[in-house]
């Protein structure tokens, strides 16, 4: 079920404070976050984040197209190695009579 409109998007309070603090700082270091569930709001545009995927931090810079999505959508947690090609698969078992 979708979140109620009257509640507004969920954004971790500490994340908002860090973004406001970074906008005043001239160094522009990426913000390290574990909050994959936070929604990207327009104030985040142009800010760099390091989003934790369960193993390492993935660098992401927020653009206009990302507004409204969750931070976790841009930090995949699983590695896809592809499907096994047909020639590498074993031969099917022969039926016994």
From Swiss-Prot:
Its biological purpose: Protein S19 forms a complex with S13 that binds strongly to the 16S ribosomal RNA.
GO biological process annotation, one example: ribosomal small subunit assembly
SUPFAM superfamilies the record matches: Ribosomal protein S19
Protein name, per record: Small ribosomal subunit protein uS19
Claim: RNA-binding is one of the keywords in the record: yes
One GO cellular component term noted in the UniProt record for this chain: cytoplasm
Key words of the record: Ribonucleoprotein, Ribosomal protein, RNA-binding, rRNA-binding
Pfam families to which the protein is assigned, alphabetical: Ribosomal_S19
InterPro entries: Ribosomal_uS19, Ribosomal_uS19_bac-type, Ribosomal_uS19_CS, Ribosomal_uS19_SF
Family per similarity comment: Belongs to the universal ribosomal protein uS19 family.
A single GO molecular function term of this UniProt record: structural constituent of ribosome
């Amino acid at each position: 079920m979708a979140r109620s409109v009257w509640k507004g998007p969920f954004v971790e309070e500490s994340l908002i404070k860090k973004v406001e603090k970074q906008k005043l700082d001239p160094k522009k270091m990426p913000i390290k976050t574990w909050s994959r569930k936070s929604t990207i709001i327009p104030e985040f545009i142009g800010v760099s984040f390091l989003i934790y995927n369960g193993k390492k931090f993935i660098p992401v810079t927020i653009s206009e197209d990302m507004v409204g999505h969750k931070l976790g959508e841009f930090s995949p947690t699983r590695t896809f190695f592809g499907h096994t090609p047909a020639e590498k698969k074993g031969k099917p078992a022969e039926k016994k009579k």
